[in-house]
Regions:
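A short beta-strand motif characteristic of beta-propeller blades
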Residues: 12-20, 61-77, 114-121, 171-176
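Beta-propeller blade signature
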Residues: 51-57, 154-165
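Beta-strand C-termini and the immediately following turn/loop, strongest in propeller blades
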Residues: 33, 38-44, 53-55, 86-101, ...
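Non-catalytic, glycine-rich low-complexity segments
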Residues: 2-30
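A flexible loop/linker signature enriched in serine peptidases of the S9 family
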Residues: 40-50, 72-81, 96-104, 120-127, ...
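Conserved beta-propeller blade repeats
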Residues: 21-35, 73-94, 124-139, 177-195
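Short coil turn/linker residues within repeat-based beta-strand modules
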Residues: 58-60, 101, 109-113, 136, ...
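Beta-propeller domains
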Residues: 2-4, 33-72, 105
């Protein structure tokens, strides 16, 4: 039996969830040697951003273990509100921004048993647009600091890869300050220059 109803008011078996549940968005593709990395945003996991890797043998899988707080890593940053590069990889070293606690973590693909190593403090500080300098043992990042009064302070910083700044924020070195907007620090191929 058919029913007549005004346009847009009839019951439909198609819901927004039906359309979006299986949606996967891909972004932030990077290559490190024979490995290719990318971020998948998965609607089926409440929009969680997952870091995946295709290794040189063609095997594809999630890369990161649980955080020290036993959380699934959500590879995302809110720097400038819309984000920025939420991870970087160089020579098998990954630095990732976890949306769950706002911290940066280091992960060494070759030494998986070490797990995720916190690199930054908890608090009202965001990091994004990450660039690893393995030669100097640093990760460069745009830092958005919300700890003070008024507007957030945006700086370009260098963070030690050894995890020491997770306990002592004074070890994070400010490279550029005094601007309203800093974005995309990029290391030259020879490692001698940093552009932003």
């Amino acid at each position: 039996m058919s029913t007549t109803a005004p346009f847009g008011t009839w019951p439909s078996p198609i819901t927004p969830g039906t359309i979006t549940t299986r949606t996967v968005l891909l972004s932030q593709v990077r290559v490190d040697g024979a490995d290719t990395y990318w971020v998948e945003q998965r609607a089926s996991q409440a929009g969680r951003n997952v870091l995946l890797r295709r290794d040189g043998d063609g095997q594809i899988g999630e890369v990161l273990p649980l955080t020290p707080a036993d959380e699934l890593v959500d590879v995302r940053t809110r720097v400038h509100e819309y984000g920025g590069r939420a991870y970087a990889v160089d020579s098998g070293i990954i630095v990732v921004s976890h949306a769950g606690d706002g911290r940066l973590y280091r992960y060494d693909v070759a030494h998986r048993m070490r797990g995720l190593v916190p690199l930054t403090i908890y608090g009202d500080v965001r990091h994004g647009d990450l660039e690893i300098d393995t030669g100097r043992g640093l990760v460069y990042a745009v830092r958005e600091d919300h700890r003070g009064e008024g507007e957030a302070v945006n700086t370009l910083v260098a963070i030690p890869l050894d995890g020491s700044a997770a306990r002592d924020d004074s070890l994070v070195r400010t490279l550029v300050s005094g601007t309203d907007f800093v974005v995309a620090p990029t290391l030259s191929p020879d490692g001698e220059h940093l552009a932003w």
